[in-house]
Amino acid sequence: MRLPNLTLLVWAATSVGLVSALPQVSYKADATASAPTVKLHQGTVRGLADDNYGLEQFFGIPYAKPPVGSLRFAKPQPLGPASSHKTVIDATRFGDICMQTVAPSPLYNMSEDCLNLNVVRPKGTTAKDKLPVLVWIYGGAFRQGSTPIYNASELVQKSVEIGKPIVFVAISYRVGPFGFIGGSEIADSDSATSNAGLYDQRLGLKWIRHNIGKFGGDKNRVTLFGQSAGAMSIALQNFAYDGNNHGLWHAAIMNSGGIAPGPLLTPKHPTVEQSFKRLANGVGCTGGSLLRCLRKANASEVQTVASNLTAQAGGTFPIPGALAWLPLVDYELITNYPSVNLPQGKLADIPVIQGNALDEGTSFAQKQLNSSADFERWVRSAAVIHNTSYTEQALQKVFELYPDVPEQGSPFYNAETATSAATTSDLNSRQYPPLTSNQYKRSAAFFGDFTFQAQRRTYLKAATLGWKKNKAKVWSYEFQQNDKFANGTGSLLGPYHGADVKYYFIRPDGRQKDPVLADRMPRAYISFVYHHDPTVLGGFEWPPYGKGKKLLQMKGDNTTVIEDAYRKEAMDALTNRKAAKVFGF
């Protein structure tokens, strides 16, 4: 099946966990009295025991009212108490996943009634234990994603093995137009929001604060954990309400995601307005209140039209599909642009780990660009959100600092080690035809920096400069491990976006994992969950980012500390104050 370039963003961000779902869905519930149960105000939750890993799992626990009918596109509403003290919630199977382009497996049902979460704890955990809590926010470009595809069994088991047991929670939230729809009618409505998906996450965190103690978790030791759009969600949550997280979480791990999902728009931006109207027209809404009509439309039809809008964007990133369903600056939850609020210190002051893969852009780079003129047209359509007097100067700096020089493109040079395959800058070494294009490597470098690397640096700059208040320590890394297949070769994309996921979730994908890194990464994360310091249990050097801007190079037998100085001039050109306005940062 040939996918349009833009939809690759969705598939790459979600497919990293597809295979990992299978071990979980094979679990069988213990229907006897020995099945684990937890009493909540909404009923008694009955889970299942997993003797293979020594865990107890509770799947599909509702945390909000179903967002259907008049609640479609609205902020999530909390659940009330159970109607009867005999109410039993069957948590032995996954809940429905949220509406999206395609379900990751036919084993999962997709519906709007998807606001549920999963809890995994060590076997025998009681309310007296008060274990630290790790909360997973999935990625998927804000258009895909679900909790079942991430199997945390080994991670929780690892925590038990090293004597630092944790409770793991995964929150489901709305994506696509159901979670991130804009338009003037949405912005002007008292009953709808452009950031329903972010509000879902926050209500899920409120549920955790009120209920996780019953599962043996400590509500005062909650760490958020996310990758890609999940990491971006966490950054936005740290940034939301002018940096007020209301004590719902206390630390964060953000892998391959920064303060913004590329450009940030407002609900009334012409691109967003166009997407709203095209969605409404696509389901037959042409007059009167389009919002009211959209709420009455069949959910599957809404999703189909939304998916088609994205696909129709073809090879031009973004517009209209790619920017159609993203978090927006709504001036309520997201009160202003990062370039405005961060210098004022409006960021949650909590410990953070934040990092990227070496070649973040290779999964998304444009394969149809044949010349510098093509590249420049693509960047103009991709990056310019607000035309200002600085627009042309900003673009010329981009063209200059991301040159038509293959040696400076991505995949970037990456030296071979005993467990990590090499990536060279020689075009002739690329075995997959699109990767032999100068413009492919150029666009991969630009996209990776524009969407991921520059956003990471923006966040870390705000967190470490201590603008007005920030004092918590932060750590950063770059994942450079290019795992080898049985024949000794690695991915032709280099250490690509999502290549690190199998180091903390189960994902049998036919490649070898470096055993040292496979122990070190989860150990560092568990250490961070317990101590807000990744080195306490790790036994290796990893200094805080700080003024020295130090990164941990994660690379099998060559894990070492490096300086975060690569492509500095180029990324500064993307994020300086004048450029930030042009590019919507």
UniProtKB/Swiss-Prot annotation:
Keyword terms of this UniProt record: Disulfide bond, Glycoprotein, Hydrolase, Secreted, Signal
Function in brief: Extracellular chlorogenic acid esterase that displays a surprisingly broad substrate profile. The enzyme's unique properties may contribute to the specific environmental interaction between the pathogenic fungus and its host, Zea mays. Additionally, the release of caffeic, p-coumaric, and ferulic acids from agroindustrial by-products such as destarched wheat bran (DSWB) and coffee pulp (CP) renders this enzyme an attractive candidate for the generation of natural aroma precursors and antioxidants.
A GO-annotated cellular component: extracellular region
Reactions listed under catalytic activity: chlorogenate + H2O = L-quinate + (E)-caffeate + H(+)
Pfam families from the UniProt entry: COesterase
Complex and partners: Monomer.
InterPro entries according to UniProt: AB_hydrolase_fold, CarbesteraseB, Carboxylesterase_B_AS, Type-B_Carboxylest/Lipase
Cell compartments where the protein resides: Secreted
Name this protein carries in UniProt: Chlorogenic acid esterase
EC number assigned by the record: 3.1.1.42
Main location: secreted
Temperature optimum or stability note: Optimum temperature is 37 degrees Celsius.
Signal peptide annotation: 1-21
Enzymatic class: hydrolase
Disulfide bonds: C98-C114, C285-C293
Similarity field: Belongs to the type-B carboxylesterase/lipase family.
Organism taxonomic ancestry: Eukaryota, Fungi, Dikarya, Basidiomycota, Ustilaginomycotina
Gene3D superfamilies noted in UniProt: alpha/beta hydrolase
Residues with glycosylation annotation: N109, N151, N298, N308, N370, N387, N487, N558
UniProt GO MF annotations: chlorogenate hydrolase activity
pH dependence: Optimum pH is 7.5.
Active site: S228 (acyl-ester intermediate), E360 (charge relay system)
